[in-house]
Design a protein with these regions (language model features):
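Short, non-ligating residues that shape and space the ligands of small metal-coordination modules
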Residues: 46-47, 78-81
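Short, charged surface segments at domain edges that flank catalytic/cofactor-binding sites
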Residues: 1-39
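Cys/His-enriched microdomains
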Residues: 35, 49, 70
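Histidine-centered catalytic micro-motifs used for acid/base chemistry in nuclease
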Residues: 50-56
């Protein structure tokens, strides 16, 4: 999918690099230790949680703590590049 965005590949690479560094941090390890998916509230073993950007990098999101949450693989794969409002609409369509 293509977005009308001014986000360059270089910016995305930079943000992914920052995200890799955050994955090594005590902050991220504590978030994973909680074992909860931000989106579905499922309990998930820490090693199976993924890092998700609430506002995706391709949509202009940044790799900052306020934009990063733990997500189960199922939710992360379904959410992909959706913004929070779009994700909510997706969930409503399921019901």
């Amino acid at each position: 999918m293509v977005f009308a965005s001014n986000v360059t590949e270089e910016e995305i690479k930079k943000e992914r690099s920052i995200a890799r560094e955050l994955r090594q941090s005590t902050w991220w390890k504590r978030k994973c230790a909680d074992g909860t998916c931000y989106y579905c509230n499922s309990r998930v073993p820490a090693k199976l949680l993924t890092m998700d950007h609430i506002v995706p990098l391709v949509r202009g999101g940044k790799s900052v703590k306020s934009n990063i949450v733990t997500a189960c693989k199922a939710c992360n794969n379904k959410k992909k590049y959706l913004l929070p409002m779009e994700w909510e609409e997706y969930l409503l369509d399921l019901t």
